[in-house]
């Protein structure tokens, strides 16, 4: 079987994944696949820190603005979309470069995860009971989902209740698909530095027009969209209703983002066999390029 060589970059929110991905894409003739459950939707730009055309700098990106805001996309759907993109990029003689902050989604794409369609059967259960069940029986899944996103919690519960081979039940879930030969990069930095970056990013989102972005989406599609349950968007709903202040909203998004970053790092340490790099290093780019060359020589 011909191996597909690829690069994958993971890291917590605001650590600096985008900048590195662009440099590596230019160096190794890559096209980038975004492994992000929100950036795949049109119009969800500012709150998801979606890469801008200027930041892309001519590098082709996939699974950005792929779906309409009112579409639904489970991890089962995302896995197929991403794997199809990998095959397409490879068939054209380029190297796929995957980038994302959610280890569960990255592992679902690269590893031997098998999912059945969630629509086959759904269970009516209280969110808190679903959380408790996942915590007691599927702790890895519990630790990697946004517990404040009720849709994600229920989806995770349905996956395991449908007796799928999921993150904690698939015997081969920790092994890379035989067809892939990835170089997995895990970016991190000192906690205080990371948290400061997160706080500044949230403030910048408001300056860039997050409020108007969310207003426009709600006016056109309502409040029941899947992506509105994500950090950076769900906190905006009570703010737009007038229930909380702007300052309280900024604080809530920042706090939720920091907590999520902590869970992301826990997942990367426990469930991903990658090479770790500190983004504060002045030699980061050269170090990564050298290591990739050694991997694929």
Predicted features along the sequence, with ranges:
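Phosphate/pyrophosphate-binding catalytic cores of soluble transferases and nucleic-acid-acting enzymes
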Residues: 1-297
């Amino acid at each position: 079987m011909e191996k597909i060589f690829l690069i994958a970059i993971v890291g917590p929110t605001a650590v600096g994944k985008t900048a590195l991905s662009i440099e590596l894409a230019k160096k190794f003739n890559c096209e980038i696949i975004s492994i992000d459950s929100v950036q795949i939707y049109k119009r969800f730009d500012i709150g998801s820190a979606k890469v801008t055309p200027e930041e892309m700098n001519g590098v082709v990106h996939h699974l950005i603005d792929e779906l309409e805001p009112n579409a639904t996309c489970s991890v089962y759907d995302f896995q197929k979309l991403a794997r199809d993109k990998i095959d397409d990029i490879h068939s054209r003689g380029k190297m796929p470069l995957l980038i994302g902050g959610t280890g569960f989604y990255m592992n679902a794409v690269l590893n031997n995860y098998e999912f059945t369609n969630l629509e086959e059967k759904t269970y009516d259960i209280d969110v808190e009971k679903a959380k408790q069940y996942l915590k007691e029986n599927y702790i890895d899944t519990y630790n990697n989902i946004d517990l404040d996103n009720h849709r994600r919690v229920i989806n995770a519960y349905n996956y395991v209740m449908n007796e799928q081979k999921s993150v904690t039940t698939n015997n081969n879930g920790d092994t890379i698909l035989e067809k892939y030969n990835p170089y997995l990069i895990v970016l991190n930095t000192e906690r205080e530095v990371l948290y400061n970056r997160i706080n500044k990013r949230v403030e910048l989102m408001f300056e860039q027009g997050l409020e108007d972005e969310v207003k426009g989406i709600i006016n056109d599609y309502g409040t029941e969209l899947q992506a509105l349950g994500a950090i950076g968007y769900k906190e905006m709903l009570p703010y737009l209703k007038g229930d909380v202040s702007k300052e309280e909203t900024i604080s809530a998004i920042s706090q939720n983002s920091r907590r999520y970053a902590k869970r992301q790092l826990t997942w990367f340490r426990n469930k991903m066999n990658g090479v770790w790099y500190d983004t504060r290093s002045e030699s980061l780019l050269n170090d990564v390029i050298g290591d990739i060359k050694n991997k694929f020589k």
